[in-house]
Amino acid sequence: MSLITSGVLLTQSQDTLTFSVTTCQGLRLTKFASSTLKDARLKIVSQKEVNGKLRLTLGAGRYLYSIRISLETGTMQCLTTVLPSTVSVDTLPGTYLESTLQRQNQKSS
């Protein structure tokens, strides 16, 4: 689990991202599943809050996931971009997320 910003929690489990957004209307859960996320080591490439919307860019390998979350309503938009074969998210600055699977493996070790 990773606290992205106050009120937004991100959980990665195999090929699914779950966003928990606390709004004035209550807690809203949104799931994003993609085969490109399977066993992916996600990195937060950028995050910015503008006019009540969180703009989040996550990356893994050659994939970028541009995510916009309305902090008021919890609604979300996602866009997946494939980078050219000569570019990898690993070369970009950012912080890697710890997945649920990684934590389970650490506990069993």
From Swiss-Prot:
Disulfide bridge positions per record: none
A GO BP entry: symbiont-mediated suppression of host gene expression
Top-rank taxon: Viruses
UniProt xrefs under Pfam families: Bunya_NS-S
UniProt keyword list: Eukaryotic host gene expression shutoff by virus, Eukaryotic host transcription shutoff by virus, Host gene expression shutoff by virus, Host-virus interaction, Inhibition of eukaryotic host transcription initiation by virus
InterPro entries listed in its UniProt record: Bunya_NSs
Protein family according to the UniProt entry: Belongs to the orthobunyavirus NS-S protein family.
Free-text function comment from the UniProt entry: Inhibits host transcriptional machinery, by producing modifications to the phosphorylation state of the C-terminal domain (CTD) of RNA polymerase II. Inhibits phosphorylation at serine 2 in the heptapeptide repeat (YSPTSPS) of the CTD of RNA polymerase II, suggesting that the elongation step of transcription and/or 3'-end processing is prevented. Inhibition of host transcription machinery leads to shut off of host cell protein synthesis and inhibition of the host innate immune response. NSs also seems to be involved in the nuclear relocalization of host PABP1.
Protein name: Non-structural protein NS-S
Organism: Bunyavirus germiston
Gene from which the chain derives: N
